[in-house]
From Swiss-Prot:
The active site is at D144 (proton acceptor). Together with CDKB1-1, promotes both the last division in the stomatal cell lineage as well as the number of stomata. In collaboration with MYB124 and MYB88, restrict the G1/S transition and chloroplast and nuclear number during stomatal formation, and normally maintain fate and developmental progression throughout the stomatal cell lineage. One of its GO terms (molecular function) is cyclin-dependent protein serine/threonine kinase activity. Keywords: ATP-binding, Kinase, Nucleotide-binding, Phosphoprotein, Serine/threonine-protein kinase, Transferase. SMART domains: S_TKc. This is Cyclin-dependent kinase B1-2. The keyword Nucleotide-binding applies. One of its GO terms (cellular component) is cyclin-dependent protein kinase holoenzyme complex. Disruption phenotype: No apparent stomatal abnormalities. The double mutant cdkb1;1 cdkb1;2 has a reduced number of abnormal stomata consisting in single guard cells (GC). The quadruple mutant flp-1 myb88 cdkb1;1 cdkb1;2 has a reduced number of large single guard cells blocked at mitosis, with strongly altered shape and size and characterized by enlarged nucleus due to endomitosis and endocycling, as well as extensive chloroplast replication. The gene is CDKB1-2. Disulfide bonds: none annotated. The modification Phosphothreonine is found at T178.
Length: 311
């Protein structure tokens, strides 16, 4: 790791510490993710190797944060502690200095609160669908999409998906290591209800929540427990029925909930165009099989006024 000078710790990600660093020879900024992957005598677990090769392949899309290289650091052997040297994997990513959460916050708080421009939301959504469609076409679910995981290249106006593809080998814990609870606000109802057979539709639900948040500048469903999260969803969209969502009552964590009627979604996102409301409605369907796919979303009328040739 002599190649890099660590400048500051920028986060404690779901998978380990994240540092802003500089490549000494070029002066280029990178993000170093130190993964908590204890090696054994066998070396790097094959699951991790598969994930890394997948990540390298996926990061060929400009809408996915690029994985530049992987550094395997073996720490010097300490005979008093263990018989074999410990080693760490560092994933070296391109560095981007802001994320969608910070960007939304800057429009909500501070000296100049203002809505995000409708055309900007449209551009960000198109890029997000491009990135998600790219992942899904390779059979990869993100499973933890949220504004903090969407990094922005403000100069080029590009949105990129981060923290991707590690979700299987490194299993997403319920608590990040700073003991903040991993947010439930973007989690699909089938996951909250304990379904183990989920699909690409879980990511579409998350993208729908992110879409609404860009319009509202605050979370659509800000629950602080799995139960409260479901109640937030049911109060707005109505309590799901077996007719609407076949099999919902057989899910592991289904209980008898109060029966709420669906509200008018446009009241939750009053400044969104009718086409935008239609797209959001198709993303927040209870039955995962009925949710629009990322690929189909790219052709939705909401994007008709967008010059797609630039993407």
């Amino acid at each position: 790791m002599e190649k890099y000078e660590k400048l500051e710790k920028v986060g404690e990600g779901t998978y380990g510490k994240v540092y802003k660093a500089m490549e000494k020879t070029t002066g280029k900024l990178v993000a170093l993710k130190k993964t908590r992957l204890e090696m054994d005598e066998e070396g790097i677990p094959p699951t991790a190797l598969r994930e890394i090769s997948l990540l390298q392949m996926l990061s060929q899309s400009i809408y996915i944060v690029r994985l530049l290289c992987v550094e395997h650091v073996i720490q010097s052997k300490d005979s008093t502690v263990s018989h074999s040297p410990k080693s760490n994997l560092y994933l070296v990513f391109e560095y981007l200095d802001t994320d969608l959460k910070k960007f939304i916050d800057s429009h909500r708080k501070g000296s100049n609160p203002r809505p995000l421009e409708a055309s900007l939301v449209q551009r960000f959504m198109f890029q997000l669908f491009k990135g998600v469609a790219h992942c899904h076409s390779h059979g990869v679910l993100h499973r933890d999409l949220k504004p903090q995981n969407l990094l922005l290249d403000k100069d080029k106006g590009i949105l990129k998906i981060a923290d991707l593809g590690l979700s299987r080998a490194f299993t997403v814990p319920l608590k990040a290591y700073t003991h903040e609870i991993v947010t439930l606000w973007y989690r699909a109802p089938e996951v909250l209800l304990g379904s183990t057979h989920y699909s690409t539709a879980v990511d579409i639900w998350s993208v729908g929540c992110i879409f609404a948040e860009m319009i509202r500048r605050q979370a659509l469903f800000p629950g602080d427990s799995e139960f409260q999260q479901l109640l937030h969803i049911f109060r707005l969209l109505g309590t799901p029925t077996e007719q609407q969502w076949p099999g919902v009552m057989a899910l592991r964590d289904w209980h008898v909930y109060p029966k709420w009627e669906p509200q008018d979604l446009s009241r939750a996102v009053p400044s969104l165009s009718p086409e935008g409301i239609d797209l959001l409605t198709q993303m927040l369907k209870y039955n995962p099989a009925e949710r629009i796919s990322a690929k189909a979303a790219l052709d939705h009328p909401y994007f008709d006024s967008l010059d797609k040739s630039q993407f």
